[in-house]
């Protein structure tokens, strides 16, 4: 394989009212590396993550938690900047949806419960608590086009409607971003397996410049 995708010999046709020349063809390399550069760089990213998390997974104090819950956002972002360069990757928030804490409810924010201010649970003054559940999708794209997207979730309960709303949205986006950065490992593992088994028929990479 020459490592490049080619459309030579392809024949295109269009229906009534559509000109073939008006169609823009875009290669979507979602779920696979677009160049040798991304394979190498993602490998470096994984080595940094593994070194950082070695102590986490060898400490009983943390238990069996998902890695995205244990590694801080700023650590992953720092690793990404070191490995890909500050201008070598970008994030896109594809959507953020919120709803209150009641299953089946459609309103964005509402009172989830009332908690007695009296620690004894008596008839003391009541304080409103607002619970908001958020879901967000974040896409991470490297400069060669390699990309991945993940969904994150969050639940926030505070005395303020706006605070719960903002906190839930922010945490859902952060959760999605962390999962997306961590998911690059799966892309490389699958790529290695498919390459070994001659899975690709359109070339290994989609980038015109395999080495960036």
Curated annotation (Swiss-Prot):
Q: Which GO terms describe its cellular component?
A: mitochondrial matrix; nucleus
What stretch or stretches form a coiled coil here? Answer: none
Which organism encodes this protein?
Answer: Candida glabrata (strain ATCC 2001 / BCRC 20586 / JCM 3761 / NBRC 0622 / NRRL Y-65 / CBS 138) (Yeast)
Q: What is this protein called?
A: DNA repair protein RAD59
Q: Which Pfam families match?
A: Rad52_Rad22
Q: Which Gene3D superfamilies match?
A: DNA repair protein Rad52/59/22
Q: Which PANTHER family match?
A: DNA REPAIR AND RECOMBINATION PROTEIN RAD52, RAD59, DNA REPAIR PROTEIN RAD59
Q: What does this protein do?
A: Involved in the repair of double-strand breaks in DNA during vegetative growth via recombination and single-strand annealing. Anneals complementary single-stranded DNA.
């Amino acid at each position: 394989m020459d490592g490049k995708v080619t459309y030579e010999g392809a024949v295109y046709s269009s229906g009534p009212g559509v000109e073939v020349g008006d169609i823009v063809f875009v290669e979507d390399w979602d779920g696979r590396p677009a160049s040798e550069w991304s394979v190498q760089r993602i490998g470096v990213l994984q080595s940094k993550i593994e070194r950082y998390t070695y102590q986490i997974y060898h400490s009983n104090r943390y238990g069996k938690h998902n890695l995205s819950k244990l590694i801080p956002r700023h650590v992953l972002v720092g690793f990404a900047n070191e490995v890909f360069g500050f201008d070598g990757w970008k994030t896109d928030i594809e959507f953020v949806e919120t709803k209150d804490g009641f299953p089946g409810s459609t309103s964005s924010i509402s009172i989830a419960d009332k908690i007695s201010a009296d620690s004894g649970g008596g008839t003391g003054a009541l304080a409103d608590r607002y619970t908001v559940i958020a879901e967000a999708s974040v896409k991470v794209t490297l400069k060669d086009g390699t990309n991945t997207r993940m969904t994150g979730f969050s639940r926030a309960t505070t005395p303020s409607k706006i605070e719960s709303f903002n906190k839930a949205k922010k945490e859902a986006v952060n959760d999605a971003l962390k999962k997306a950065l961590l998911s690059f490992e799966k892309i490389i593992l699958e790529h290695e397996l498919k390459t070994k088994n001659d899975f690709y028929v359109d070339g290994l990479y989609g980038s015109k410049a395999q080495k960036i």
